[in-house]
Amino acid sequence: MNGLSVSELCCLFCCPPCPGRIAAKLAFLPPDPTYSLVPEPEPGPGGAGAAPSGPLRTSAATPGRWKIHLTERADFQYGQRELDTIEVFVTKSARANRIACMYVRCVPGARYTVLFSHGNAVDLGQMCSFYVGLGTRIGCNIFSYDYSGYGISSGRPSEKNLYADIDAAWQALRTRYGISPDSIILYGQSIGTVPTVDLASRYECAAVVLHSPLTSGMRVAFPDTKKTYCFDAFPNIEKVSKITSPVLIIHGTEDEVIDFSHGLALYERCPKAVEPLWVEGAGHNDIELYSQYLERLRRFISQELPSQRA
């Protein structure tokens, strides 16, 4: 679809959809969970274990220590040593959903922790191999979470829940691990750029990375859309100018899901944008396979952040 026809315009303005419906139709494809959380026994009276029994999937979160159990579909690429670096727990959002969180200690004493908001149609189980590899290669620890309705997180996916979910993750990272905002890099991929831009527009942090970002839901569905309507969803284009931290935008020139023009438009609207990474020939899901991806991330983190230039 390359633009708005007369009938589509009539439909939009006579019966405009609510942002939630646009969001649901465009964005959310939660996979079947590829993991569960298994309680670790804790010392109790007389040495007895005091952890709850049974795996945690969508049941109420309980205090205690948990380990992640991955299914074959998670396709974990590492061994037990790397798996032992992954901490998992469940927190609660302001919208009363239980949000699964993952902290990957890739580098002891790392200067930065990346708060990673993943793309669509994946969950923490499928992403944890990538997190181990990414954190090790860029010298950062990785913190991530599953959106409402993804993985073992409860609730249903929605735009409002996305914003509440990342707020819960941000607070958990800061309070549970004592990570200060100037040590947090917000990283959003695809649909994950939506909560990332929203949070970054409200809080200052060390830096922001937008990987294959979208400008808004309407602009994805109707590429000729030039303005943001009141019923639009995911209005990154209206929020990106409010970000006060350095922003690196990464986009493939042959992106078949979110057109390259979205990355260009956000770059032009973002006063804190640094030199972007436009990956020639890359699509929506293969940017990480190009050597310049890691090279640009390393240079951004090691040379271009204010704390590194001081």
Curated annotation (Swiss-Prot):
Catalysed reactions, as listed in the record: S-hexadecanoyl-L-cysteinyl-[protein] + H2O = L-cysteinyl-[protein] + hexadecanoate + H(+)
Name the record gives this protein: Alpha/beta hydrolase domain-containing protein 17A
GO molecular function annotation: palmitoyl-(protein) hydrolase activity
Function: Hydrolyzes fatty acids from S-acylated cysteine residues in proteins. Has depalmitoylating activity towards NRAS. Has depalmitoylating activity towards DLG4/PSD95. May have depalmitoylating activity towars MAP6.
Subcellular location as annotated: Cell membrane; Endosome membrane; Cell projection, Dendritic spine; Postsynaptic density membrane
Keywords: Cell membrane, Cell projection, Endosome, Hydrolase, Lipoprotein, Membrane, Palmitate, Phosphoprotein, Postsynaptic cell membrane, Synapse
Membrane-topology annotation of the record: Lipid-anchor
Record note on modification: Palmitoylated on cysteine residues located in a cysteine cluster at the N-terminus which promotes membrane localization. Palmitoylation is required for post-synaptic localization and for depalmitoylating activity towards DLG4/PSD95.
GO biological process, one term: protein localization to membrane
UniProt modified residues of type Phosphoserine: S307
Keyword Lipoprotein recorded: yes
Domain of life: Eukaryota
Taxonomic lineage: Eukaryota, Metazoa, Chordata, Craniata, Vertebrata
Keyword flag Cell membrane: yes
